[in-house]
């Protein structure tokens, strides 16, 4: 995103244009998905809805009160539409969101990234209760720190983030057994493909 570092006034105007466009497009997408059968009414929203939200050079801009107020104004209709039509929403932060990393600096950046997604969910009206209306922010339990490090990091997240987080088994470092170790603390998502790659075991829909 080189344009974020060029011509500050132009970049800020582009930020306004992009955030407004993305929020409006999300509402239209939900309205389209609302025409599908109930079991298919789900949308995974993209992490890039707000450009550079966690970039060090842009954090102060995004945290300005007028920007935060505007984000809440334009994101609220997304949640309203989803609840009106029974569309389940989710986020899936990228591979660099490693809440169980052994490196403290990576954990700090990962918390910042996860809370960015929690901010968007909060503006949409989610996070007040445990996975309200099926909303989830799903991340892999990746990182060499495993379950113990993840649980320490979990306690540092905002209440809304803890209400919405789900953990998915990873294909490389932390498989199904590791995710089950945190099942008393957080909701789990089972990725059948990742489990097959990690263990060689295939789980079918008919298995007990």
Where are the language model's segments positioned?
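Acidic/histidine-rich catalytic cores of soluble enzymes
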Residues: 141-143, 147-208
